[in-house]
Amino acid sequence: MHKKKYTFSMWMKYLEKFDKKDRKNLFELKLIAKKLGLLNLKSFFFTVGGTNGKGTTCAMLEKLLLDSGYQVGLYTSPHLINYSERIKVNGLYLSEKDHIFSFLIIDAEKGNVSLTYFEFITLSALFLFSQYSLDIIILEVGLGGRLDATNIIDSDLSVITNIGIDHTSCLGTDRISIGREKSGIFRKGKIAVIGEKNIPISVDEIAKEKKTILKKIDVDWFWTRTKIDSWNFIHSNIELYNLPVSRIPLSNTAIALASLFYSGLEVNLKKLKSSISKVQLSGRFQTVFNSPRIILDVAHNVHAALYLSEKIDEIDTEGQIYAVFGILKDKDVAGVVQVLQKKINYWYVVNLKTNRSASINYLKKKLSLNNALFFNNINESWQAIKKVITKKDIILVFGSFFTVSEFMSIKDRRLTLY
């Protein structure tokens, strides 16, 4: 069948078959983007990289900019349920028809060039943005930075939220190596906002080499939690007090604020507090049901698990905590579990619907948990939990975007059984 007749779901299946090869440079990708006129868009670009917190930082940045009256495009990854989640224009998702049109354009222009899934959809996102008069475009880095598809764009301001150990097979096994890869998004003479206090030396080295201006937390800008329900943000040009506590990590809200103020863009300070309090991102310590409380979190590495552990400590519960846990085989499985082992009473370990999943046999060998049950899929674990759960208990679904996504696909029709 000719691709002009492809439905949206057919395009999804087609794209999922694309190569996953490692790229040595971005030359071919830039060539396609140049032909499409995507390298000279007049928008102000933010490129947001880092190990964790990219999505929430982007979501907060988008909200702050929209409420300041800007026309904003947002590109994030991965999606939880539907591909359309990845691309928003002025806070709204685009139609399947829009995406299909863009896919046809990119597919025709790439010719015989072999692209990865992420490279193809990044070009598609940029093409869609080019169809609008956008003041600002926010790009979330997919993986690393230096060789990431988003790095074909020379951003006006780059962000590194933090640097942890993840994706070691392609980024390196230590923070210095990973920091070097993530700093690949830096640009000469441009500002890069750094959201972590103890960054590896490689970040400073790349910044010096590229003549990038670093704006570091606790050096150039600051934030402090003052009360349980308020915090302060201090920047060289502005001081904000008694800000509301956001529903995303405060550290990422602060990074978004720093990025916005260092961009030089005008900010609507009157709407700032309202903007901060409204942002919520699916799968980020998201409560989807109460009594019993069900929390979804995409935490999948040690750095994210540490934050999740802190959030669990804030919960006042008389019941037990059950974990529905599925994780990919290339992650630090033992490290993630070790962080949360003492916080969780019962582990319901699952196999995920992806060939990247850590198998049940692998997890049984890797984990020394006396309080764990193992299941072939999320649905089986869910049926088992429902037989023992009480209204005072907590169910924590975490370990991967896949884990949360698979749970979200069954939760709506199952919650009524409580």
UniProtKB/Swiss-Prot annotation:
GO terms for biological process: folic acid biosynthetic process; one-carbon metabolic process; tetrahydrofolate biosynthetic process. 7,8-dihydropteroate binds at T116, Y117, F118, E119, L147, D148, A149. Mg(2+) 2 binds at H167. Its EC number is 6.3.2.12, 6.3.2.17. Its cofactor is Mg(2+). It holds the Pfam family Mur_ligase_C. Keywords: ATP-binding, Folate biosynthesis, Ligase, Magnesium, Metal-binding, Nucleotide-binding, One-carbon metabolism. Pathway: Cofactor biosynthesis; tetrahydrofolate biosynthesis; 7,8-dihydrofolate from 2-amino-4-hydroxy-6-hydroxymethyl-7,8-dihydropteridine diphosphate and 4-aminobenzoate: step 2/2; Cofactor biosynthesis; tetrahydrofolylpolyglutamate biosynthesis. Disulfide bonds: none annotated. Binds 2 Mg(2+) ions per subunit. ATP binds at G53, K54, G55, T56, N252, R284, D297. GO terms for molecular function: ATP binding; dihydrofolate synthase activity; metal ion binding; tetrahydrofolylpolyglutamate synthase activity. It catalyses: 7,8-dihydropteroate + L-glutamate + ATP = 7,8-dihydrofolate + ADP + phosphate + H(+); (6S)-5,6,7,8-tetrahydrofolyl-(gamma-L-Glu)(n) + L-glutamate + ATP = (6S)-5,6,7,8-tetrahydrofolyl-(gamma-L-Glu)(n+1) + ADP + phosphate + H(+); 10-formyltetrahydrofolyl-(gamma-L-Glu)(n) + L-glutamate + ATP = 10-formyltetrahydrofolyl-(gamma-L-Glu)(n+1) + ADP + phosphate + H(+); (6R)-5,10-methylenetetrahydrofolyl-(gamma-L-Glu)(n) + L-glutamate + ATP = (6R)-5,10-methylenetetrahydrofolyl-(gamma-L-Glu)(n+1) + ADP + phosphate + H(+). GO terms for cellular component: cytoplasm. Mg(2+) 1 binds at S77, E140. PROSITE patterns: FOLYLPOLYGLU_SYNT_1, FOLYLPOLYGLU_SYNT_2. Transmembrane segments: none annotated. Functions in two distinct reactions of the de novo folate biosynthetic pathway. Catalyzes the addition of a glutamate residue to dihydropteroate (7,8-dihydropteroate or H2Pte) to form dihydrofolate (7,8-dihydrofolate monoglutamate or H2Pte-Glu). Also catalyzes successive additions of L-glutamate to tetrahydrofolate or 10-formyltetrahydrofolate or 5,10-methylenetetrahydrofolate, leading to folylpolyglutamate derivatives. Belongs to the folylpolyglutamate synthase family. Monomer. This is Dihydrofolate synthase/folylpolyglutamate synthase. The lineage of its organism: Bacteria, Pseudomonadati, Pseudomonadota, Gammaproteobacteria, Enterobacterales.
